[in-house]
Amino acid sequence: VHPDRHAGPQAGHADRLTRITAVAPAVTFYTFALAIHIAAVVIAFGVTFAYPVMYAVGIRSEARSMPGVHRIQDSVGKFVISPFLGLALLAGIYLASKLHTWSDFYVQWGLGVILLLGALGGAFFAPRERKLAELAERDVAAAGSGEVSFSQEYKDLRKLVFRVGGVANVLILLTIYFMTAQTGA
């Protein structure tokens, strides 16, 4: 006969509580890290899906605002996207290490995409967004009080940034799918 059976209905309950409590902090921290990872991705990249709308509205109805739009993009890259990309990476490293999933496709894909997006942010988007601001400012100044007509140089660079941004957004969506489905796990 088990000794707890004679000690009443609550006997053994404290032991079970101790075992549950000992496991709970690890589960809670993992869940916290997962929430941080997801939130960091949403904060870092959510705005990038609004950029095409900002471009369209700016070009069509607020052409004089385009230098500011590009400066805002540059600042968002520095102060929102980059830091939260770093946080998503750190949380992802913890999650992959905790679950020992480094060899799974979705982890390798996610790591590759986050490193690529970080590199694109610093080496591609930031300098081109600053250049777009300069070109737009020049074109707005050249228009004087008349209608703004953007130069071909501005249009070509804006189109390039728009296309690369579109590819980046597709990579983000694919990564979300692969992570959710745990593709290759």
Name these PLM-found stretches.
Residues R16-A185:
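Polytopic transmembrane helical bundles with strong interfacial aromatic enrichment
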Residues P3, A7-A14, T18:
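Short linear motifs in low-complexity or flexible loops
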